[in-house]
């Protein structure tokens, strides 16, 4: 008798190992929560790094001088407006604000008038030998070079024209720097517009000026708003030209006034300087907050496409 025929034979297991779908879903959910938490922590750290200097500046501006010198903590024990009162009443900081506003707005308007017209002509004119793109980059070169490279020629020119001692040197210098940026930025916006828009206007009998002001400009307003904010902020914060081309304290701008506050009487009043900093960035911050949608849409839709 064959004994081996009576023994049980082991057969290989042919089934599939099943994993619960609920277990997979929970594992994926936990992973998703961990990633979300890490992103939130990184965002909080970045926000803290970006906003803490602003918070500290405001804190120093509203603290009394005695509390500021004691090196108090993150929460003020007393809030005062003495620094702002001394800034505007005793130091005449309002004059610097007015000068900066006049200079920035004047330079902005002149830059837009000349820059938009030039950008429109470059975008619509057919250049030989593919010179359009090199031309736009050569124009931008004026913006890329450091301001110090133009100071001596501009100083000589403005002195010859008897403009020193007025606001015009600062306005014209800021305009010189902003126009290339306006041209380079807006060329891409005009190139994205189909020429059929202007052809339809010509059929209706519109002039070149009417085509530009009534048809083309309304379609590129996000770009105009974005470049306006960038140009305004540059002119508002401009220091190099101001410190060399400004002679009279009556024409001081905000950067110059803040520099004087830092060095006046050989003693720095940190609360006073902080109040000047808050007063200088607050108008621009409010302007950017209210117009940030135009800035984002303008920067995104006007990106240069190769």
Name what the model sees in each region.
Residues 1-35, 68-90:
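Membrane-topology segments of multi-pass transport proteins
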